[in-house]
């Protein structure tokens, strides 16, 4: 929970120092991805814990009571029952990543291009929509900046809508 309260710019500085300098990755898409992974890990961990807590203890005790192994109970009872909450947390974390700029500015660089082939350019600096928005505002290109902002807003709202839809769909299928 403490990690969730850390500002994203601090994660960006950590990613720049640790991944960029200490590991020698420099400004690259890989450095940005690793930093974002560490940044959203607390969110995914917390939502997964909450989803696992919502599974009734009677499911666990019932499976173990009829002789199921602990691993079989986790794989066939616990995880499928908690999957709606886990997926919702992952989708919300993706929504947070899409709108992130501070951590990426320090780790992935501020290139003016989006990579055409992700795997051949993974160790090079690249651009994202949030960084493009920042760069357009710096150059007083307000029409382009507002266009990028609208695209970002639609993407984030779409991801949040998808999370709500998936959560509702799984709850309906589960009979909740």
Q: Over which residues does each language-model region extend?
A:
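Generic hydrophobic transmembrane alpha-helix motif, especially the helices
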Residues: 1-36
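Glycine/proline-centered hinge or cleavage motifs at structural transition points of membrane proteins
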Residues: 7, 66-67, 80
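Residue-level recognition of transmembrane alpha-helices
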Residues: 13, 33-36, 77, 106, ...
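Alpha-helical membrane-protein architecture signal
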Residues: 30, 37, 41, 59, ...
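Membrane-embedded alpha-helices of multi-pass transport/permease systems
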Residues: 31, 38-60, 87, 91, ...
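Transmembrane alpha-helices
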Residues: 47-48, 70-108
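C-terminal transmembrane helix and the adjacent membrane-cytosol boundary/short C-terminal tail
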Residues: 49-53, 57, 64, 91, ...
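Interhelical loop and adjacent transmembrane-helix boundary motif
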Residues: 104-152
């Amino acid at each position: 929970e403490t990690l969730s309260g850390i500002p994203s710019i601090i994660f960006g500085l950590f990613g720049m120092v640790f991944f960029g300098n200490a590991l020698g990755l420099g400004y690259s898409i890989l450095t940005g991805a690793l930093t974002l992974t560490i940044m959203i890990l607390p969110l995914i961990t917390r939502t997964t814990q909450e989803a696992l807590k919502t599974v009734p203890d009677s499911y666990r005790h019932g499976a173990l009571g009829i002789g199921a192994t602990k691993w079989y109970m986790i794989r066939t009872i616990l995880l499928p029952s908690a999957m709606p909450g886990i997926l919702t947390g992952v989708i919300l974390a993706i929504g947070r990543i899409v709108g992130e700029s501070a951590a990426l500015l320090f780790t992935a660089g501020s290139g003016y291009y989006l990579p055409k082939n992700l795997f051949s350019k993974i160790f090079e600096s690249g651009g994202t929509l949030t960084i493009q928005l920042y760069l357009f505002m710096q150059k007083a290109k307000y029409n382009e900046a507002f266009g990028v902002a609208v695209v970002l807003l639609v993407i984030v709202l779409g991801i949040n809508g998808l999370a709500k839809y998936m959560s509702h769909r799984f709850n309906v299928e589960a009979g909740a």
